[in-house]
């Protein structure tokens, strides 16, 4: 018997992931444990920056019209979805890092760039900047929400839980009793996310 896939990421990523899973005829349980909300931000002067760093598609979805001030800069995006949304937003030059921010920073370092503006969420994990100055501009918050009753029944099915961030992994670990963890398989987007799951 194939285990159901438990998708806990916030919308719209939850529905997008579910659609891809269903295309492979996988049984899904879509239960977001977070909601992404924009936060007010003051656009910094783009002049000192040689590029923007985008580690999450949520930054592009929530930044709003002020993002237009930075479209002339090259965008460095983690993941294909983030890169696609950067192009859709109007960035003409988009460099994609397919795996994680650490590898992308290594790639950026070879270009000799010295200062980037990082559009990000309130909760961001530290990473090696490879000597590059990174100024963070918080444009969203990923806020935990109470799981519905269907969450407990989904856990009882012994699902394969997908975690798309260390924050999501930590939240899942917080909600699942230690004795129940042996019945849940985990698929993590990165080593950091797997480690955060405990």
Protein language model regions, located:
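Signature of uroporphyrinogen-III synthase
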Residues: 1-198
């Amino acid at each position: 018997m194939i285990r159901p896939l438990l998708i806990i990421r916030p919308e719209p990523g939850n529905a997008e992931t579910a659609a891809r899973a269903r295309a492979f005829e996988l049984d899904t349980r879509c239960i977001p444990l977070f909601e992404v909300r924009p936060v007010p931000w003051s656009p910094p002067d783009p002049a000192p920056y040689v590029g923007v760093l985008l580690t999450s598609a949520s930054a592009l979805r929530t930044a709003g019209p002020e993002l237009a001030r930075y479209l002339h800069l090259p965008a460095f995006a983690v993941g294909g979805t983030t890169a696609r949304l950067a192009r859709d937003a109007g960035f003409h030059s988009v460099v994609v890092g397919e795996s994680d921010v650490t590898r992308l920073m290594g790639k950026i370092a070879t270009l000799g760039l010295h200062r980037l503006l990082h559009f990000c969420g309130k909760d961001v994990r530290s990473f090696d900047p490879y000597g590059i100055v990174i100024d963070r501009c918080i444009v969203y918050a990923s806020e935990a929400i109470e799981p519905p009753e269907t969450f407990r029944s989904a856990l009882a099915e012994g699902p394969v839980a997908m975690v798309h961030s260390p924050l999501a992994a930590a939240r899942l670990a917080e909600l699942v009793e230690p004795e129940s963890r042996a019945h849940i398989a985990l698929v993590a987007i990165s080593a950091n996310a797997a480690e955060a799951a405990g």
